[in-house]
Amino acid sequence: MKIAVDAMGGDNAPKAVIEGVMKAVEDFEDLEITLIGDREKIAAHLTEHGRITVKHAEEVIEATDEPVRAVRRKKNSSMVLMAGEVAEGRADACISAGNTGALMTAGLFIVGRIEGIERPALAPTLPTVSGDGFLLLDVGANVDAKPEHLVQYAIMGSVYGEQVLGVKNPRIGLLNVGTEDKKGNELAKQTFQKLKETDLNFIGNVEARDMLDGVADVIVTDGFTGNVALKTVEGAALSIFKMLRTTLTSSFTAKLAASALKPKLKEMKTKMDYSEYGGAGLFGLKAPVIKAHGSSDGRAVYHAIRQAREMVSQNVAAFIEEKIQQKADE
């Protein structure tokens, strides 16, 4: 199995990317990695390894670049060349922590969309209190959506939940402003009815406040709402940890308490750490495309690679294509 990795994407590239890659090839003997980026900058951090190859890229798509223009004009960028490795069959999946919009553009126009998929979806796995996590899609690939798109999101999410998260018959929830059947705007109401008509394990509407309690294994929504929900969860988690840090260092007694609680606090932080779950998958493409968080460290990159490897080994793209075709034939 070969995975192409954008060595220049993210705030901590290429050092953090290479750290993640090195750990991945150590842990997974079936894995080969193609690192794409500035050869000299990569060489400064890379220890030679038989299953890691380097492909030089003269350009980098920056976080501030306009996505579509950047993909069209920077043909020799690390991200575009990475997507090309997949499109041309030299890699089974690809990963970048770079410009999200550019990665979605490269995924859509270079890797290509599965036949029958109307709109791809960006889908991260978020933490839950139990530690199992849940899939949220879409979180920004498409800010406007139709009910039919959300039904496809649910199908793709169900496949991922079963094949990668290991959940039998995943519970599908629709993000809404209330749990009652007739709640929400027109999109939510129509989507609710369409999901009820599928053979998915649709449990009905779920509210944002219940997401982290693990009420559903997969939660679907439009990209605008999903992105707001994602950023709210991220911001709230960061604020809570800042408050804890301030409180537990505010006095000598507090510091003593913090020392006693340190193992449990570390356990809680690990459980709520997004990087443990990998990156956000761009679902609906012909091969796995993973968006790692822009601030990813080596550990986060490692988990994104682990996620991509699992998606390839479980034939997630092929299963999605099969389920979408079955739905179209109904």
Curated annotation (Swiss-Prot):
Subcellular location: Cytoplasm
Gene Ontology CC: cytoplasm
Pathway annotation from the record: Lipid metabolism; phospholipid metabolism
Gene3D superfamilies associated with the record: Isopropylmalate Dehydrogenase
Function: Catalyzes the reversible formation of acyl-phosphate (acyl-PO(4)) from acyl-[acyl-carrier-protein] (acyl-ACP). This enzyme utilizes acyl-ACP as fatty acyl donor, but not acyl-CoA.
Family: Belongs to the PlsX family.
Record-linked HAMAP family: PlsX
Protein's recorded name: Phosphate acyltransferase
Species the sequence originates in: Bacillus licheniformis (strain ATCC 14580 / DSM 13 / JCM 2505 / CCUG 7422 / NBRC 12200 / NCIMB 9375 / NCTC 10341 / NRRL NRS-1264 / Gibson 46)
Phylogenetic classification of the source organism: Bacteria, Bacillati, Bacillota, Bacilli, Bacillales
